[in-house]
């Protein structure tokens, strides 16, 4: 049982409804965005590879930018959306997600899906790190050398949907754990 499951059980003793992502929101597959499209400034962009190597559970700033002309043809990411990777060289990394909490629309490209929803974005991004999600994505993944979980397949993933106030309380607790863990790691490395 994950920490999220424990918190849901504690905060919602009557249980919660599980719903497919495709019912909770809309999953929009990105298209094309090689790193050669990056510019010094312009429209914020998150490349799927950066979700593995640079971003944590959420972010308010992008590391990369593309021209407005390039951005016009890419998948739009609005504040509160979650970007989920579709492709990886291993099962562990496919489906890694980052919640976009910035104040402007940004873009993403291929090998990523934008999840547009009305839930707490950080709750979704945290839930996409759970063993429950891992078990479901394992069944939906295809490929051997390159693993893929399509946007269509992600629509079938079922997740718990507690009330928004419970989602926010779970996020508050998990954020606190994340902060404490980072502080402890910093002290151990010092």
Residue ranges and their predicted role:
Residues 1-11, 82:
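Accessory (non-catalytic) regions of SAM-dependent nucleic-acid methyltransferases
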Residues 7-31, 190:
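Non-catalytic DNA-recognition/assembly elements of restriction-modification systems
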Residues 10, 32-33, 70-71, 101, ...:
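Short, solvent-exposed loop/turn positions at domain surfaces
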Residues 15-17, 155-189:
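Amphipathic alpha-helical segments
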Residues 22-35, 49-81:
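Sequence-specific dsDNA recognition surfaces
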Residues 47, 69-131:
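A short beta-sheet element
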Residues 104-106, 187-190:
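Short amphipathic alpha-helical linker/capping segments at the junctions of internal repeats
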Residues 105-111, 142-162:
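A short glycine-rich beta-alpha junction/loop motif
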């Amino acid at each position: 049982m994950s920490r999220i499951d424990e918190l849901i059980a504690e905060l919602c003793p009557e249980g919660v409804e599980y719903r497919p992502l495709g019912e909770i929101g809309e999953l929009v597959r990105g298209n094309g965005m090689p790193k050669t499209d990056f510019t010094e400034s312009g429209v914020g962009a998150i490349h799927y590879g950066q979700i593995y190597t640079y971003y944590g559970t959420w972010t308010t700033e992008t590391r990369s930018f593309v021209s407005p002309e390039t951005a016009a043809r890419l998948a739009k990411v609005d504040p509160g959306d979650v970007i989920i990777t579709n492709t990886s060289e291993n099962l562990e990394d496919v489906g890694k997600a980052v919640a976009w909490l910035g104040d402007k629309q940004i873009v993403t490209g291929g090998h990523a899906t934008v999840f547009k929803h009305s839930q707490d974005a950080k709750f979704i991004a945290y839930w996409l790190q759970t063993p429950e999600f891992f078990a479901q994505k394992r069944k939906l993944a295809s490929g051997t050398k390159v693993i893929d979980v399509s946007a269509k397949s992600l629509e079938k993933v079922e997740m718990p949907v507690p009330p928004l106030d419970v989602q926010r309380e779970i996020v508050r607790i998990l954020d606190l754990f994340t902060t404490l863990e980072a502080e402890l790691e910093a002290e151990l490395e010092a």
